Each structure stands twice: as C-alpha cells, then as structure tokens.
Amino acid sequence: MGRVQTVVIVKNAQGLHARPASLLIKTIKAFDCEVLVEQSGCKANAKSIFGLLSLAAGYDTRLTFTAQGREARVAIEEIRRLFERNFAEVYPAKTGSLIQRGTSQEKNSI
C-alpha cells in the first residue's frame, strides 16, 4: 500500500468550482483510500468540499493529488480521467453558459 501521485492542470475556465468539486468527491469516495490535494504548498482532504474549494483553484492551476490505501492507484486514474475530460463540461463561445456533454442541449448548441 504505497503512495500514488498525479499532477493535473485545471482547464475549466471557471476553475474547480462547486459542481466539478462535488463530482470529484463523489468519485474519490467510491475508493478505499485517503486522498490529499496540494496547491502552492496548501494541502486539503480531497474528500472535503470545503477543503477543495478553499484551494481556490482557478483556470490553469496545478494540483497534486496523493492517494494512499488499497485502491489508491485506481482512484488516481479516475481523478486524472476527470481532469482530462474537463469534468464533461462544455462552455460554448457564443453563450458562455454551461452545457453538459452528451445531452440534447449540447447537440442543439453546435
């Protein structure tokens, strides 16, 4: 049960706000491990909405996630996947409003 770590960059124009933070927490809580996140020397419990939001991670912020426990490796893989997919959020240039990927709303906005 070693430590597993990944570094991600926040690519959401609105940063790591409440909706993606909630999805991140829900994802992490599914795994048997502890996860910490660090940004510029500040550390937080990645399973805590207050911890995540207190980092004030805006666009282009670098975050380091460290997991330890039985399912640490798979948790880190899922965290990386969420950030790579930008939490499945799309912000069309014309409206600037949030559209969930894979919905009819997304198809109509293109």
Question: Predicted regions: what is each one?
Answer:
Residues 1-3, 110:
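Short, charged N-terminal helix-start/capping segments
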Residues 3-7, 62-64:
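Intrinsic-disorder/low-complexity, polar/charged segments enriched in Ser/Thr/Lys/Arg/Asp/Glu/Gln
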Residues 9-58:
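Compact, glycine-rich, soluble single-domain proteins
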Residues 44-47, 95-99:
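Glycine/charge-rich, flexible interdomain linkers and switch-proximal surface loops
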Residues 50-54, 70, 78, 105:
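Alpha-helix boundary/capping detector
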Residues 59-61, 104:
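N-terminal processing/targeting junctions
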Residues 61-98:
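C-terminal structural segments of small proteins and small subunits
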Residues 96-110:
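Short, low-order "capping/linker" segments at domain edges
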